[in-house]
Amino acid sequence: MSVTTLLAISLGAILTNNFIFAQFLGICPFLGVSKKIDTAVGMGAAVTFVMGLASAFCYLINLVLVALGLEFMQTVAYILVIAGLVQFVEMFLKKNIPTLYTALGVYLPLITTNCAVLGVALLNTQNDYNFIESVVYGITGGLGFLLAIFLFAAVREQLEISGDNPKAFDGFPIALVTAGLMALAFMGFSGLKVW
């Protein structure tokens, strides 16, 4: 494992293989929580935290499952780990940052079923990453999610403020068009070569 490998994993997770724009994972909170920048950043930070921890714990769980010959239980075990981590984040936010807890509302418990969080754990196993690579991929994948939801929320806020949208595009339709255009912009990174 070299710094070049970690850099390639990081750039891939943030830009070229962004969970939102390239792999289309985590779309529900992306569309649901992106109306305000503050809420979007809070959700992105929570997802980043859970993805980083889930990557670490799921790597260790996978070692135990492989040693016991229970590889077929990976998905179930990963979901249980993610559910526990989300409960921890929910209790932490409720106690320490109640305004963010209220703003995230129903979307916070939905991190448990966020396919981006489960996807990072499964992709770590599929790509045969070691512990450090798994954690780096989880954290930078979360940062890519945070970047995507932040940029999308910023554009959505500006579109709401401007009010120049055709009536047929008000609300959700213009959000989908914006997400599509942003995905095209991120696809421009797919030709990026790292060393």
Show the residue positions of the predicted features.
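Ordered, amphipathic secondary-structure segments that act as subunit-interaction surfaces
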Residues: 60-105
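Cytoplasmic-side transmembrane-helix entry/capping segments in multi-pass membrane proteins
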Residues: 38-49, 73-78, 100-112, 167-173
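Interfacial loop-to-transmembrane junctions
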Residues: 157-176
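Structural signature of hydrophobic alpha-helical transmembrane segments
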Residues: 6-21, 69-84, 136-148
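Helix-coil boundary and interhelical linker segments in multi-pass alpha-helical membrane proteins
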Residues: 1-7, 60-73, 122-135, 191-195
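Hydrophobic core segments of alpha-helical transmembrane domains in multi-pass membrane transport
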Residues: 8-9, 16, 47, 52, ...
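Generic transmembrane alpha-helix signature in multi-pass membrane proteins
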Residues: 24-32, 91-95, 107-110, 115-128
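C-terminal ends of transmembrane helices
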Residues: 25-39, 86-100, 152-163
